[in-house]
């Protein structure tokens, strides 16, 4: 009997350990509230969901956030911002324009119109600048401080087109301490992802700078049945960001940011007759790496975008005044054989 009781206790302990591990795994990289445990102490999570730095526990808004290595792991496979879909409860993102023009849905609310001029109820804010046009919303994510997904109407603080919520992206800013990194990864279909950054002080406690760069690429991996050649699926995506932070006094901060992006590749691949009537299952007409396109242009996509932002902050002890001036532009084209 004693041996049986000991065995049962061991099995119970093992079962509890497995259940505990499974429950922890389900939390995912995004958490709300997120609790980071270091040496037995819970690290405080700071967010800017109300346009000021606050502890996540003190913000009366539904916010999911993540930072650091979680973000690196999320985008190390050369994924774009659509990678957030499925990782954040209540958020879905998709695009019918390849690596451009994403559409966001928060708690089921969104706009399915694929017109590039259509407004959306989910806004993307990058470094305090509203990326209103869908072409601007796909700027590559790299050298990130954190991402905050704010659910629910946010018009009071962030203005129009925030009926469903906000995706708020904050990149790493310049600092006096010299720091930097470089990361690289390689995957199937010749997929490569290389990004890095370096920054530090130029004038002690007065002027600092940071330069970040990214290069992503993939080879053609989809065969066009009409030609027998692998001529679809490729992309070359490069981006660079330069920041200059000037703090002439303890009360004045000026941040100048310039970023550019160049994309060349294949747009979305559309397929026909891959479902049977009355069924949601893919039929034998669907082959992941084979399509039949007889057009002259093979779904080309090319975009160039750039943006300049000046962020001025004046501190008045109990309050602060901010001025954000930004000019964003994008030019390009995308074609798809439907």
Enumerate the predicted regions with their spans.
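Non-catalytic regulatory/gating segments with a bias toward low-complexity or hydrophobic composition
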Residues: 63, 71, 84-85, 147-152, ...
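Outer-membrane beta-barrel domain signature, strongest for Gram-negative TonB-dependent receptors
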Residues: 229, 235-338
